[in-house]
Amino acid sequence: MSREVFICDAVRTPIGRFGGSLSAVRADDLAAVPLKALVERNPGVDWSALDEVFLGCANQAGEDNRNVARMALLLAGLPESVPGVTLNRLCASGMDAIGTAFRAIACGEMELAIAGGVESMSRAPYVMGKADSAFGRGQKIEDTTIGWRFVNPLMKEQYGIDPMPQTADNVADDYRVSRADQDAFALRSQQRAGRAQEAGFFAEEIVPVTIRGRKGDTLVEHDEHPRPDTTLEALARLKPVNGPEKTVTAGNASGVNDGAAALVLASAEAVEKHGLTPRARVLGMASAGVAPRIMGIGPVPAVRKLLRRLDLAIDAFDVIELNEAFASQGLACLRELGVADDSEKVNPNGGAIALGHPLGMSGARLVLTALHQLEKSGGRRGLATMCVGVGQGLALAIERV
């Protein structure tokens, strides 16, 4: 018999633009910020009893190497006795970290965990593989910021290696999502994020990041990526990434960003023992695979699998946080799931097109934003879902308590 698992606290850093304020911060230092904030916000917890820190991270080719979860928890001042593990399901890594913690607590192996994710895409390194033979030449330098690297020739032969924007155009073609609809979706994301920022919505979930400098410290408190003054006319002027006949542009796609998030998960026993306040229970998580060339449709089978498992319908959810990797795939997923393009339930405070998409952080950001929206609106259930590179989808459901 599985046990109830509660989310008791949830915070994140601001999301930085590519090359923006947070580009000065290493990924391990960035991940330490929300971890340290959770410790400070919950002084009654005996943190030596923390069973595990689960962090998602998609890159791990640079300063986020060698188990960034362990590095970050030590930098945050958690006891040396607390273990940490880094998970990688590409852009869904942060959500998978939450789901992994949920399952460990639900089955009775753990009582108290922190889960979240981090990504510093600004600091993603260039890498070069070793030669296959002595004195080999022609080695290729790979940019690890996003997408394929060190491709297996068999993968290329059997499945293709379409870049992420091409997979989004594939979805647009296969599911007949127009450029006009994609731009309208992107505009809604920007406008909603702008309204949320103006109303101070994100202040409830953001912990600031201090940037040390020779001329003094700078405090980063707000998301840097939103462009609330964007217009349809401006979006329409952008050239498609994959050629004039295609529809995906920089304006209707998510950003390349930096950020970190973390949540406290606990059993009922741990809640009572440590004086925690349960804010939501995790209902479940489900994953699914799809063709890599249309990876953006991955949320559809993942959500359907989760709904079957929970015996719920899509309209049972008061908020749906759908990661906006691209407007084309976001719209295709909503339509396949029977949700209106402009539903007020979906990303009511904007999504990744406006806020940005730091890969390993985003899944955790979706869950904690869904939690804060449920608390603000008085809603009951929240659904977070996202597509994953190489053809997967992930979905996680929560219920406010």
From Swiss-Prot:
Annotated pathway: Aromatic compound metabolism; beta-ketoadipate pathway; acetyl-CoA and succinyl-CoA from 3-oxoadipate: step 2/2
List GO BP terms, alphabetically.
3,4-dihydroxybenzoate catabolic process; beta-ketoadipate pathway; fatty acid beta-oxidation; phenylacetate catabolic process
Keywords, in A-Z order: Acyltransferase, Aromatic hydrocarbons catabolism, Transferase
PANTHER family documented for this protein: ACETYL-COA ACETYLTRANSFERASE, CYTOSOLIC, ACETYL-COA C-ACYLTRANSFERASE
Q: Report the EC code(s) recorded for this entry.
A: 2.3.1.174
Active-site residues (renumbered): C91, H357, C387
Major enzyme class: transferase
What does the record give as the reaction this protein catalyses? Answer: succinyl-CoA + acetyl-CoA = 3-oxoadipyl-CoA + CoA
What's the name of the protein?
Beta-ketoadipyl-CoA thiolase
Among PROSITE patterns, the record links this protein to: THIOLASE_1 (PS00098), THIOLASE_2 (PS00737), THIOLASE_3 (PS00099)
Family affiliation: Belongs to the thiolase-like superfamily. Thiolase family.
Taxonomic lineage:
Bacteria, Pseudomonadati, Pseudomonadota, Gammaproteobacteria, Pseudomonadales
